[in-house]
């Protein structure tokens, strides 16, 4: 797979910006987590099957891996969601890279985050407009570092643009049971 890689240096970390032609991600090797991902919903009605697909580790980038997700409450949270790119198997497989995966609380990933992802696809269908999304992974306050070295995000900010309307949502990295995705709109 071809990647365009731009190296960024900051005071506290080493990060890479990677554009794989489907989404763009800034990835922190220090946190072993993405810092942000940008994408445009491509296939809101795609039917490609995820069956048999698993996350893969890209070459030359220190990422999280399966060990970070064992025996805990964190899912491999797609930031550029697989369902928005299920045009075909090849496109879908690009979303299964660990550069596109964050340690996301299972209650968030399977709850209101998933419902907001469905809204993105529904909006692309209903309005017939491009739906552009930026997901920012938050590392604020006291952070948890797993024994494997990966840092657990404190939350996620999702910025959705449909035409000339932009809305921002901020989710803590915790269970969202008993809430609605609209509750997380950033006012």
Regions inferred by a protein language model and the residue ranges of each:
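Sec-dependent N-terminal signal peptides
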Residues: 2-13
